[in-house]
Each structure stands twice: as C-alpha cells, then as structure tokens.
Regions:
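Internal/C-terminal transmembrane anchor helices
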Residues: 78-104
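Alpha/beta-hydrolase active-site loop
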Residues: 243, 248-304
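Domain-level recognition of soluble alpha/beta enzyme cores
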Residues: 98-209
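Primarily recognizes the serine-hydrolase "nucleophile elbow" in alpha/beta-hydrolase
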Residues: 282-348
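Short substrate-entry loop that stabilizes the transition state in hydrolases
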Residues: 190-249, 363-364
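Membrane-embedded alpha-helical segments of integral membrane proteins
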Residues: 24-70
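Active-site-adjacent alpha-helix of alpha/beta-hydrolase-fold enzymes
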Residues: 351, 357-429
C-alpha cells in the first residue's frame, strides 16, 4: 500500500513539474521533498526493488525538471513535444502502477497461536549413505533442515525469509524460465519468526511435525504454515531435499542446485523412495539428538510419542509413504501431491490421513482420465487419479479447495496474481489451509477439537471435505 501511495503522489507531482511549471521554486522544491520522503519511507519499510524502477526513474526526471531547467512554463509550444511528454507520462504511470500490483511483496499472515515462533537451521550428514543424487559428488549425503518451535517472547532477532535469498531467487527464475530480476524481491518478504530464539521454558511437551517441500522448491516454501503451526504448539522441521530443492547451501558455502528429473512413473517412484530415506534419517537424528549441541534445548520441547508429517506435492507423497511405513508417524497430510512411491496398502493407511487437492488439479486429472490430455502428462495424471481413489478408505479425509491450483498451497501463491486461479483469494486460502491442517493434527496428535473439521465444513459450504 505504501508503494501505491508513493506512485500516486509521484504521478500527481509529475503533472505539475512537467506540464505546469518547472524550475527552482519553493513550491517545486516542496513537491520534490514530499516525493523523496515517500521514496525513503518505501525503501526503509519495504526495501528498494526492481518493481519500482519506473518510479525511481520518473523521480529522477522530476528532479532534473526542477534543478536543470529554467523557470518557465513547462508545456512545449510544439504539439509533437506535448504528445511525446504525455505518452511518456502515460507509459510510465502504467508501469509504476502495474508492476507493484502484478508482483506484490509476499505478505505472510501473522500466526494466530499463543506462542512466539523461533527458528534455527541445522546441517545433517548421513555417514551411512553416499551422495547418489548429485552428479560428481561422492561425499556423504548432506541435508539442511529448518526448525520452527515455540520460543521465549523477546528473544532472537527477526528472521529473514531465506538465508541465501539471492541464490534461491536465481534458481527459481532458472527453473521457471523467468528473468532473474523477476524473483529478486522475494528477499523483501517479512516473516513472523525469530532467528535463534530461546526455546520456550515450559514443562509442556509439544508434538513434532515434519514438512516436505515440492519438487524444485525449498524447505521454507510454506512459511505461512510452518509459523502458524509452531505458534499453535508444535515443533516443525522443514526438510530441504538436496538435489531436488531449488537450491541448498551448506555452512561451508557449498551450493547444490536442483537437478533435472525424468518425468516417468518409475523415476518419480524412485525419487519419493529417496525422500523417504532422507526423512527417516532426519527423524532418527532428531530423536537421538546428537547432531548439534544447540538442538538439545529444542529437543527438550518434543513429545516423541506424537509425531506427524505433512508436505506439498512430492513432499506430500513422501508424507503418505512415511505414514504407512514408519510406526513413529501417527498422522499425515498430503497437500496436492500425486501418490508416487510404493503402492498404498489395499486397506489404506490404517492411520489418520488427509489428502488435500486443488480444484484445478482435480480438473486436470479428470481431463486426463477422459483422454483430453495426451502424452506423458496424461499418463502421470491418470496414475495420480487412480492412486487418489485407492486411498479413499474408511477414516481418510479427502479435501478439494475451490478456486485453487497447485501453487495455492505455498507462499508463492502470493508472489503474483498472474499464477493464481480466477477469483482466487490467497489470504483466505491461507487461513482455510491453516485451519484444516491445524485442526487435523490437533485432533489426531493432541486429542482435541474432535468435531472441528466438520465445523470447518459448515463454515465453508463450498469446501469439498469428505470423511470416508
């Protein structure tokens, strides 16, 4: 909003300084000072970024109009000059207004729970597995995790969205075929968590949740959700799957970007199996608690009898696999993830499970089933459709959220309306997704709010929520 106000003031000022009167007058200097005040306010509060380049340029031009032009009427006597100036203002105005609207700063919802959220990154090395994912890397398998936890109020410093944000922005641009400049403003995203905050000093123990990101994304891609869950009394560990995440940067500076993958059922099944191995390793390390001395105070918060997992896309598929294979995982959620990996048991997971899908995903799966989509994409969507059906066993929840697509479950839904569904309300979807996920884990790990999921269905009649 501050950027839009700055643009509006700047545009009104340009009418005066270019078309009515230019030159070094008290009025013009005052107009300039007002604009520079807005400029510095936006830079301090939000940060300088590429989306505002047209505005910066126009302010530079207005400054020249005041200090380098004689005091005279600014309207040219030649019609051509008038037209050119007018067109220039129109084009600049359109750019100034549209860029911040098309590429807004991601606004994460403030957590609604009672706990302050702390966060800390850890580096894990699996000495029992060699790196087989990353080409020309024969070291032990390495992973980064980001932990979110209830913390003491007033401790720690505000956390950045992603520690190596420039590298992340660069790689997201590469994988999505976009210019690097388009993603650079990700670094302006403000979080509601505190880096290295002191873990809460309390007798209470909290359930542990593991989070798996989507293919080519990153562990913090669902910060809107990770912070909310920690504020509600969960310790949440977000995994960054090396070689499959957009980028992974280790403490020694070594960087591993995402590798190309083969889009075949066999290859995708194998990838999920690798992610299972990573997740099992992380869970083992967390339970043993010996990988980092500073983790001990966080480990003391955890109730290891109450562990769940959730994830988006391939991270969701991994959550489903962990649920049926690891007795320590008591409940799981798959957010719009095709159920790749090993086939689900005929009787279903036999433990609390929720499969959430975007309305657009369901639409594409039905089109594939009806042969309206051809090629490998059709084959993959058909497999996902059939596997979704096999999971619909007694006790399983299936959810379809209207006006959503695959990205709607992530922070990147707020990156640009260009990638949203028509009439999609990103903020409202974040609220709904958080309600569903928190209520599901509250019910199945904390034993509270037994009917809260059904209550959510009543609040959102357009929501397709079914308990099989």
């Amino acid at each position: 909003m501050l950027e839009i106000i700055f643009v509006a003031v700047l545009l009104l000022s340009s009418i005066t300084l270019i078309f009515i009167e230019r030159g070094l007058t008290k009025k013009n200097v005052a107009i300039l000072l007002i604009n520079y005040a807005f400029l510095f306010a936006t830079i301090i509060v939000i940060g300088a970024n590429w989306r505002m380049i047209p505005a910066y340029f126009l302010l530079f031009v207005l400054t020249l109009q005041v200090f380098l032009k004689p005091k005279t009427t600014a309207v040219s006597k030649k019609l051509v000059m008038k037209v050119l100036k007018g067109l220039g203002i129109i084009v600049t105005a359109i750019a100034m207004f549209t860029l911040p609207l098309l590429f807004p700063i991601i606004t994460l919802p403030e957590p609604t729970g009672k706990y302050t959220v702390g966060t800390k990154a850890f580096h894990l090395i699996d000495k029992n597995r060699k790196e087989t994912t990353v080409p020309n890397n024969h070291r032990d398998r390495e992973l980064m995790i980001q932990v979110y936890y209830p913390a003491e109020k007033g401790s720690g410093n505000p956390s950045t969205y992603f520690e190596n944000i420039n590298e992340l922005a660069e790689q997201l641009a590469v994988t999505n075929g976009a210019p690097y400049i388009v993603t650079t403003h990700l670094g302006l995203t403000k979080t509601h968590s505190y880096q290295d905050a002191k873990p809460l000093q309390a007798q209470e123990k909290f359930p542990l949740l593991l989070f798996g990101h989507g293919m080519g994304l990153y562990g913090q891609q669902n910060t809107f959700q990770l912070e909310e869950l920690a504020s509600q009394g969960y310790v949440v560990i977000a995994l960054n799957f090396t070689g499959y995440a957009a980028t992974t940067i280790f403490p020694n500076g070594n960087r591993v970007d995402s590798i190309p993958i083969e889009n075949t059922p066999t290859a995708l099944n194998t990838i999920v199996q690798k992610w299972e191995q990573d997740t099992t390793f992380v869970l083992n390390e967390v339970i043993e608690g010996n990988f980092d001395k500073s983790f001990k105070t966080i480990a003391d918060l955890i109730n290891y009898d109450k562990i769940g997992m959730f994830g988006h896309s391939f991270g969701g598929a991994t959550s489903a696999q962990m649920l049926v294979k690891d007795t320590r995982i008591k409940a799981a959620i798959d957010m719009d993830g095709g159920l790749f990996g090993d086939p689900m048991p005929k009787d279903g997971p036999q433990k609390p499970f929720m499969l959430m899908n975007a309305e657009a995903t369901i639409h594409f799966m039905k089109e594939a089933k009806n042969q309206k989509i051809t090629g490998i994409q059709n084959e993959l969507l058909e497999i996902v459709y059939l596997r979704n059906k096999t999971i619909e066993k007694p006790g399983v929840y299936t959810v379809v959220i209207p006006k959503t697509n695959h990205t709607s479950f992530t922070d990147l839904a707020a990156f640009s309306p260009i990638i949203n569904e028509p009439d999609e309300d990103v903020a409202a979807n974040y609220t709904l997704i958080n309600k569903l996920v928190t209520s599901f884990f509250d019910q199945n790990l904390k034993g509270i709010n037994e009917n809260h999921l059904e209550d959510i269905q009543k609040q959102y009649p357009e929501l397709q929520l079914i308990k099989h």
